[in-house]
C-alpha cells in the first residue's frame, strides 16, 4: 500500500481538528450581513449570531443577572467597596477637594455665599430669634452672671485711673461755679424754712440754744445772697475749700476703694439679678434693632474673605478633617449596615444593569464579537484547540490502521 495513503489521514485529521474551532466560530458570525439576490435573501445569511444578536444579548443579560450579578453578590461587592476605611478616605478626599476649591478660583464665589448667609443671619434671622429668646426669664442668664462675677464684681480702679477720673470730675462736674450754682438752687426759701424748723425742733443741748436763739435762716439766706451777688468771690472761696479740705485726695482715695465687694452680699445678689433683668429687657425691646443695625453696618464681604483665609491657614481645620471624616464614615457605616440590602434592592432597578448589558451587546458589531470570542479561545481555551488537533490526529491514525488492515 502507498505510504502517503497511510500518512494522509492523520495529517488531515490533525489539520481539521485543530482549525475546527476557528471554522465553527466563523460559521456562527459570517456573513455579517444578509446577502440578497434580487429581492430574495440567501439562506443562512447573515450568520447565526448576527441574525439573533438581540436574543443573544437578552440571554447573556439573563445569565449574568441570574448567576453572576445577583442582588446578594452586588451586596457583597458593595460591602467590600464601602468599608469604613475606604469611606473615611473618600470623605476626607472630598473635604480636602472642597477646601482646595475654596482656596483657588472659587474663593470669591464662596466668600459671596458666606457673606450672604452671615448678612441674612445678622439682619433677618438673629433679630427674630433674639425677640423670641428674650421673652424667657433665663435668657443670657448664665452669661450675664458670669460677666458680673468675673468682671464687674472684681472691678476696681487703679491709682492712675482714679487720679484721671478725679481730675475729670473736678475739672468738669465739681467745678466751683457748678457747686455755687448748686448751692443757690438748693437754698430756696422753702428749703431754708424746712432746715430752720428742723433744727429748732429736733436738736438738743448747745445746738438747740444756737438754733432757737440765733437760728440758721438768716445765715442761709445771706449765703444764698452772697453766692448770687458775689459770683467770682464765691467761686474763689469754694476753690479754697476744695484745696484746704483736700477734696481731690479724698475723692481719689474713695474712687480707688470703690468696689462691689464692699457691699453686703444681699445687695450684690440684688444688683446681679437687676443687671441680668436690665440686659434682658434691653434685648427684648431694642435687641432686634441692634442686630439689624449691626447687620447693615458690617462689611460682610470683606469679613467673609478674612474668615475664609483664616480657615485656610488654620491648623485646627486640617487636624479636624480626619476627625470629621472618621465620624461621618462611622455614621454612614451604621446606616449602611442596617439598610444596605434595602438600598441595593432600590438601586438595581435604577441602574438597569440588564438593559445596559443588552444595549452593549446590541451595539457591538458582529465583527467585534467574533474577534472577542476568538481572543478568548486563543488566550484561555488553547487547550481545547490543541485537544481538537490531537483527536483529529487519533481519528486519522485509526483510519490509517483500518486501511492497512484492509
UniProtKB/Swiss-Prot annotation:
Topology in membrane: Single-pass membrane protein
Main location: membrane
Residues in the signal sequence: none
Spans traversing the lipid bilayer: 384-404
Keyword annotations from UniProtKB, A to Z: Cell inner membrane, Cell membrane, Membrane, Transmembrane, Transmembrane helix
GO cellular component term of the entry, any: plasma membrane
Pfam families: DUF445
Subcellular location: Cell inner membrane
Domain of life: Bacteria
Claim: Membrane is one of the keywords in the record: yes
Family: Belongs to the UPF0754 family.
PANTHER family tied to this protein: UPF0754 MEMBRANE PROTEIN YHEB
Protein name listed in UniProt: UPF0754 membrane protein SYNPCC7002_A1087
Native organism: Picosynechococcus sp. (strain ATCC 27264 / PCC 7002 / PR-6) (Agmenellum quadruplicatum)
Amino acid at each position: 500500500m502507498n505510504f502517503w495513503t497511510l500518512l494522509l489521514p492523520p495529517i488531515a485529521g490533525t489539520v481539521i481538528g485543530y482549525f475546527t474551532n476557528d471554522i465553527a466560530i466563523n460559521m456562527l458570525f459570517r456573513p455579517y450581513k444578509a446577502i440578497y439576490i434580487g429581492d430574495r435573501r440567501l439562506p443562512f445569511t447573515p450568520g447565526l449570531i448576527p441574525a439573533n444578536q438581540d436574543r443573544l444579548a437578552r440571554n447573556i443579560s439573563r445569565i449574568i443577572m441570574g448567576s453572576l450579578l445577583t442582588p446578594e453578590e452586588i451586596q457583597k461587592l458593595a460591602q467590600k467597596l464601602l468599608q469604613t476605611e475606604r469611606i473615611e478616605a473618600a470623605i476626607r478626599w472630598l473635604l480636602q477637594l472642597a477646601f482646595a476649591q475654596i482656596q483657588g478660583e472659587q474663593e470669591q464665589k464662596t466668600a459671596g455665599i458666606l457673606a450672604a448667609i452671615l448678612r441674612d443671619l445678622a439682619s433677618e434671622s438673629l433679630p427674630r430669634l433674639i425677640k423670641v429668646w428674650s421673652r424667657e426669664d433665663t435668657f443670657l442668664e448664665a452669661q450675664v452672671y458670669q460677666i458680673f462675677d468675673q468682671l464687674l464684681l472684681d472691678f476696681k480702679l487703679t491709682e492712675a485711673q482714679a487720679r484721671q477720673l478725679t481730675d475729670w470730675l473736678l475739672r468738669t462736674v465739681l467745678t466751683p461755679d457748678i457747686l455755687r450754682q448748686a448751692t443757690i438752687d438748693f437754698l430756696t426759701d422753702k428749703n431754708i424754712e424746712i432746715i430752720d424748723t428742723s433744727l429748732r425742733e429736733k436738736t438738743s443741748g448747745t445746738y438747740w440754744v444756737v438754733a432757737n436763739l440765733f437760728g440758721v435762716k438768716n445765715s442761709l439766706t445771706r449765703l444764698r445772697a452772697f453766692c448770687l451777688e458775689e459770683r467770682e468771690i464765691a467761686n474763689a472761696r469754694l476753690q479754697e475749700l476744695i484745696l484746704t479740705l483736700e477734696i481731690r485726695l479724698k475723692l481719689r482715695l474713695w474712687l480707688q476703694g470703690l468696689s462691689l465687694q464692699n457691699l453686703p452680699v444681699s445687695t450684690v445678689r440684688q444688683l446681679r439679678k437687676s443687671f441680668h433683668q436690665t440686659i434682658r429687657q434691653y434685648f427684648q425691646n431694642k435687641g432686634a434693632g441692634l442686630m439689624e443695625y449691626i447687620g447693615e453696618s458690617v462689611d460682610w464681604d470683606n469679613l467673609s474673605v478674612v474668615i475664609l483665609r483664616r480657615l485656610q491657614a488654620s491648623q485646627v481645620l486640617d487636624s479636624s478633617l480626619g476627625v470629621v471624616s472618621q465620624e461621618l464614615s462611622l455614621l454612614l457605616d451604621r446606616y449602611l449596615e442596617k439598610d444596605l440590602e434595602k438600598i441595593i434592592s432600590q438601586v438595581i432597578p435604577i441602574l438597569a444593569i440588564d438593559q445596559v448589558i443588552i444595549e452593549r451587546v446590541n451595539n457591538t458589531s458582529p465583527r467585534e464579537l467574533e474577534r472577542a470570542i476568538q481572543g478568548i479561545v486563543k488566550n484561555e481555551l488553547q487547550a481545547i484547540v490543541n485537544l481538537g488537533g490531537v483527536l483529529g490526529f487519533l481519528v486519522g491514525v485509526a483510519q490509517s490502521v483500518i486501511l492497512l488492515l484492509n
